[in-house]
Design a protein with these regions (language model features):
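Anion-binding alpha/beta catalytic cores of soluble intermediary-metabolism enzymes, centered on
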Residues: 1-207, 211-279, 283-297
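Short acidic DE-rich linear segments
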Residues: 299-302
């Protein structure tokens, strides 16, 4: 099917390796390794059945070094992309959760938002990880992160369990990553408007100029990035999954060809080992080219 589509579109894919899961020579070794990884939770038969699905097969291919990264989700839910990754790839040392971050672009402006896709009601400690990992993702996309821990309260102006959670998470972030510019808990208007910041949060190095926004839960985060995308004119790149031992990224089941293409490049760029990686300027150029392609495609589709 891939070769037929390439021929029909007059694309040269001679340099591409296409692996057919149904005729994969290393399937027996893959089954044995997955049985071992699942530690008795799955039989050989169950593992073979799982590996007949592209999400598990692709994840094991990454685990065994047959691929450097994985981009899925076009025909699977986010849960079906993340579950195999958690079971087989697992989180990086020091990370307890997988989270996600969207990069939103409008002209020369870039902002980051997390966690818009994975953690429904993150705890204080979850928010700490989400903020620190989202700041790292923001840097990859050429953003110097100024992190706003969003709430309906600014520095104690409101009360409630959510306010306490965000305020405590902010304190923990400052202890865990003292080099990171972070403010919270803070309302959105105070995080982006210098005039409002002067009234609500004077003297803050983040208030009024935040560019990395961490939401208290997935309701606020998912609604927030979609408002920015649909009404604010931003182009959304992501979600970029964070905290895993290998780059695994998720697409929306409503994705188009441009989004698949763009996220493929981003995912591949994230898979380059740190000691071999292009410099920050080079990586930013790659990402910028991807974003520009998405924006151009969006204008063309209009």
């Amino acid at each position: 099917e891939v070769k037929a589509a390439a021929k029909a579109g007059n694309f040269n894919i001679d340099a591409c390796q296409i692996i057919d899961p149904e005729n994969y020579e290393g399937i027996d070794a893959m089954v044995a390794e997955m049985v071992k990884l699942r530690k008795g939770k799955m039989t050989d038969e169950q593992v073979r059945a799982a590996l007949s699905k592209s999400n598990y097969f692709g994840t094991m291919l990454v685990k065994m070094g047959g691929a450097d990264c994985l981009l899925g989700g076009a025909t699977y839910s986010t849960a079906d992309t993340v579950r195999p990754a958690l079971q087989l790839i697992k989180t990086k040392p020091g990370n307890n959760i997988v989270s996600s971050c969207f990069i939103l672009v409008r002209g020369d402006e870039k902002i980051a938002m997390g966690d818009c896709a994975i953690n429904i009601d993150p705890s204080e400690d979850d928010l700490v990880e989400i903020a620190i990992e989202s700041a790292k993702t923001a840097k990859i996309f050429g953003i110097d992160p100024k992190v706003a821990m969003l709430s309906y309260s600014t520095l104690g102006s409101g009360k409630g369990p959510s306010v306490t959670k965000v305020a405590n998470a902010t304190k923990k972030i400052k202890e865990a990553a003292p080099e990171l510019a972070v403010e919270g808990e803070i309302q959105f208007d105070a995080s982006v408007s210098p005039e409002v910041a002067e009234v609500k949060c004077p003297g803050s190095p983040v208030a009024g100029q935040a560019n990395t926004f961490i939401f208290p839960d997935i309701n606020a985060a998912n609604i927030g990035y979609k408002i920015a995308s649909r009404l604010g004119g931003y182009t959304a790149v992501g979600p970029v999954l964070q905290g895993l031992n290998a780059p695994i990224n998720d697409l929306s089941r409503g994705c188009n060809a441009e989004e698949v293409y763009s996220m493929s490049i981003v995912t591949a760029a994230l898979s380059v080992p740190e000691e071999e990686t292009v410099d920050e300027e080079g990586l930013e150029a790659v990402v910028r080219a991807v974003v520009e392609t998405m924006i151009a495609a969006k204008k063309l589709n209009k």
